[in-house]
Design a protein with these regions (language model features):
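Active-site substrate-recognition segment that forms the wall
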Residues: 31, 43-51, 55-95, 180, ...
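Predominantly flavin-linked oxidoreductase catalytic cores and closely associated redox partners
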Residues: 151, 155-184, 191-280
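Rossmann-like flavin
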Residues: 86-210
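C-terminal catalytic lobe of FAD-dependent flavoproteins
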Residues: 164, 305-306, 330-332, 346-441
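Glycine-rich FAD pyrophosphate-binding loop
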Residues: 21-41
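N-terminal Rossmann-like FAD-binding beta1-loop-alpha1 element of flavoenzymes
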Residues: 2-28
Length: 441
């Protein structure tokens, strides 16, 4: 079967990898000149099952009010005259109840743990070098109230099999001595030994190279303008994709199935087909600094929970990423938010890096209100979704690619997860956590 994959980020490339391993002919269409040029380019580097608590949680509404008007707020809403943003925001608030948060954590952990194990298998098979660190992930807190608020989610994660252990200040410093300059401010933390970190760009480009060697066709600088459908009702299907190629010519690429892995841009492509996904872009920032003193720079990947920043050592670089700006599709850098990242990093590790050589970047995370991605089927028999992974695309990427390859091949993935458009085998709930609004054909 010929499968067209739309998008060559970590999710699309992993989908292509597993589809070719399942015996399919695969062609990947990507508008950028290479793989991992957008959201997968310079993220925080964490493969973090322990980061399963969604942004939408019981403490989020009050935090949003507290952050209102702050240009450097960890989560910044810029309200626009745009119905999708308002509808997304209302659904986000609806997901902030304790019951919805607990359900969403279960789903996120299921796909994240499946993906972590899948990544380990791919790494063993391919030997891709991507500055991998398997030292775990450390969350630390500098606010006692926020630390106490984190405990129920951490306890639930432990109950679900994620070994996220609550620790005291002394243990935080023992695990990562580089935090010693702020020891007096740390009130506690938690540590997950099985989490990892690494450079998603290096991994994705390495995997894309091995995909190409295995027979996958990549067409870069290729814009998909629309998907062509035929039939109605149960017989509706996609017969191809209209593109503008690297020479500016219009073409039609035909295939037997299509996998949409275009992140935040999936929404616009699918809307004319009557598939309205609840995905909105969340602009995330990162800063990358050259390390100048190995003894003072951290080795363990960390999350600074109070500032919503993740910190990963990538060889001789330190990557610090985070914050979220709900403000449409602009990737323009806000100097205030960039400076806030560097200011906090200097507070933590004052002499570890050359902060004058900061490389700033912003990418659009495809956010669903619940943080649960769309992985599965649509009303079109041969159109599949692998999108909406939010802040956890690197964490969920390999597992999502493996799962969608199973679904395209007509098989049920071996994990208990709310796959889109598919019946659940175990966990059920009266409420759908991510609404998919579909118009009748």
């Amino acid at each position: 079967m010929k499968v067209i994959v739309l998008g060559a980020g970590i999710v699309g490339t992993a989908s292509a990898w597993f589809l070719q391993k399942a015996g399919h002919e695969v062609i990947v269409l990507e508008r950028q000149p290479g793989a991992a040029q957008e959201t997968s380019f310079a993220n925080g580097g964490q493969i973090s099952v322990s980061h399963a608590e969604p942004w939408a949680n019981p403490s989020a509404p009050l935090k949003l009010l507290k952050w209102l008007g702050r240009e450097d707020a960890p989560l910044l809403f810029r309200l626009r005259p745009e119905w999708l943003q308002w509808r997304w925001g209302m659904e986000f608030l609806r997901q902030c109840t304790p019951g919805n948060t607990a359900y969403n954590i279960r789903q996120i952990i299921a796909i994240a743990e499946y993906s972590r194990q899948t990544l380990q298998s791919v790494r063993a098979e391919t030997n891709i070098e991507y500055d991998c660190e398997t030292r775990g992930i450390l969350h630390f807190y500098t606010d006692q109230k926020e630390f106490q608020q984190s405990l129920p989610a951490a306890n639930l994660m432990r109950d679900l099999g994620c070994p996220r252990q609550t620790i005291n200040t002394n243990e935080v410093i023992r695990i990562e001595p580089a935090l010693a300059p702020i020891r007096h401010k740390i009130v506690g933390g938690d540590f997950t030994t099985t989490d990892e970190s690494g450079d998603v760009y290096k991994f994705t480009t390495g995997l894309a190279s091995q995909c190409a060697e295995a027979g996958v066709t990549f067409r870069f600088n290729t814009f998909v303008t629309r998907l062509i459908s035929e039939g109605t009702g149960a017989s509706a299907r996609i017969v191809g994709a209209e593109i503008i190629d690297e020479h500016g010519k219009h073409q039609t690429i035909r295939g037997d199935s299509v996998v949409v892995a275009m992140g935040s841009f999936s929404t616009h492509l699918l809307k004319p087909l009557g598939i309205n996904l609840m995905i909105y872009p969340g602009k995330g920032y990162s800063a990358t600094y050259p390390v100048i003193d190995n003894a003072l720079a951290p080795r363990v990947s960390m999350t600074d929970d109070g500032h919503k920043l993740v910190i990963s050592r990538l060889g001789d670089r330190l990557r610090v990423a985070g914050t979220c700006e709900i403000n449409g599709y602009s990737r323009a850098l806000n100097p205030v938010r960039c400076e806030a990242i560097t200011r906090r990093t200097q507070e933590l590790f004052p002499d570890a890096c050359d902060y004058n050589q900061a490389q700033y970047w912003a990418g659009l995370r495809p956010l669903t209100p619940s943080n649960i991605p769309y992985i599965g089927k649509t009303k079109y028999s041969n159109l599949f979704l692998n999108t909406g992974h939010g802040t956890l695309g690197w964490t969920m990427g390999c597992g999502s690619g493996r799962a969608i390859a199973e679904i395209v091949s007509g098989r049920q993935p071996e994990l208990d997860f709310a796959f889109t458009g598919m019946a659940r085998t175990s966990v059920t709930r009266a409420m759908i956590s991510i609404p998919v609004h579909v118009k009748n054909s």
